[in-house]
Amino acid sequence: MANVVKGLLTTYASTAQVEGGYFFVVSGSGYSPKHDTSSYMFIGSVDAWLNDNDPPPPTQNQVVVKGVLKNMIAAKLITSSNMCPVVQRIDWTTGTVYDYYKDYEDMFTRDEYKKLTKLFYVRNRFDQIFKCLYNNNGGQSTVEPILQPGTTQPGQTLILSDGYKWIYVTTIDKGLKKNFFDDSWMPLTVGQARADSTKPAGLGEVNAINVSTRGNNYTNGTDTTIVTITGDGRGAKAYANVYNRQIQDIIVTEPGNNYTYATVTVTVPAGYPGANAVAIPIVSPVGGHGSDPISELGCDRLMISVELNGAEGGKIPTNISFRQVGIVVNPQLKTGAIPTGTIYNTTDLCYVTFGTGSYQSGEQVYQGANLNSASFIGKVCSWDSSNNILHLINTQGTHTLGEAIIGATSGTTRVSVQYDESEIAIGSGYLMYVENRSPVQRSPNGNEQLRLVLSF
C-alpha cells in the first residue's frame, strides 16, 4: 500500500509564537502558558479511512481535534535530539539546468506544494552543499561540484569546465543524516552561524561576475581590458579573459567586502579596441556565502524524528495498525502535572478473565444490557490474547469491575477483573500537528522511524 500522508500544522503553532514573542518583550523570556514545556509525538486512530490509499486531509474544527486526542494510542517525548531544521533535498544530477543565485531576485519563491521554483543549490555525492553562481547562460550542468573532503571552507568557489560556477556552503553532518535525511529533505546543522556583518565579508562580497553580453573587437588576453567594480563596498577586483575577440569570462581575484550592491564596467586601455561587453556582479548575503546556511537556503521546515522500538517495554501494542501521527504539547497527567517520562501508553488497559472468542481491533465493547443503554463503552485498539488484556481508546461512561465486557461486533464476552486508566489525561494539551496516513502496521520485532516535517 502506498504511503500517503496528509498533514496539518494547527493554529496552536501560530498562537504559541505570538504569545512567546509578547512575553519575550514584556518579561524578558519567551515563556507563555502555551509555550512548549513538554512535547510528545503520538500515534493514534485504528479506524480505517473510507479509502486507506487516500486518507482525507485533517481539519481543525473542535470535533476533529478532540477526536484526535481521544484516539491517541501512545506518546513519546520529543527532545532536542529529535529535532532538526531541514531544507528541500536537491541532488546534483548531470544534464540538469540549474538556476543560479541572484542577490537582486527572490530566490525562495515556491509552488503550490511549497517546493522551491528556483533550484539554485545542490547536494553532491559527498553530502557537500553548493550554491550555483552561474549556469553558463542556461546550459546543462555536466560536471559535479566537488571539493576534497576535509578541506572545505564556506565561500570556496569552483569554476568548472561546463561553464558552471559554484560556491561551497556546508556539508551535511553524518550524525544528523541517520535520522533527518530522506527522499525529500536534508538536515542543516544548528549552530552559532548567522548573518553577521562583522565577518570579513561584511554586508556582502562579490564572488562572481557573469558576462551577459560578450562585446566585440577586443584584443585576446587577460590584460587587454580593465574591469572596474563600483558600489557601496570596497576592495573587489577582477580581470577578464578575452579570446575570439570577445569577453568570455570575468574572474574575481578579490571579493572585497561591505557591498550591498555593485556594478561592473569593462573598458580598454588607451590604444586597444573593443566595446559593448556587459557583465553582472553577484553579491553575497550578509556575512558571505556559507556563513548562515539555514537562512541562505531558505529553511522554513523543522523535522521531528522519533523512533518507536517494538513494544517500548510493553507500553505500545505491536499487533495494530495506526493511521494518525502528531504532536501534542503540554499534555497533563491525571494528577494535573506535566509529564516528563519518555514513553506513555495512552490507552486504558482492561484485564479480563480467560474464555473463548477474541475481541476485534476497532470494534466497540460495552458493559450493560446492550450498546444503546451501556454504562460503559470503549473502542478496541488492541486485544492481547496471550495476557487477556484489552487496550481501549475513546472510552465513555464508568467502568465496573466484575461485570462482563462485551464485543459489539465479535460477541466475545469476558469479565473485567482489573482496569488501569491511562496516566495521561486524555484530551489535555494542545494539538500542534497531525497527519492522516495510510495504515502503518506495527510488528513485535520492528521499529518505526516516525518523521514529521513542520512548515512555518
Regions found by a protein language model. Give the residues of each.
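Extended assembly-interface regions of large multimeric machines
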Residues: 1-140, 149-187, 320-351, 356-358, ...
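Conserved, function-critical positions that sit in or immediately flank catalytic
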Residues: 159-456
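Acidic (Asp/Glu-rich), glycine- and aromatic
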Residues: 144
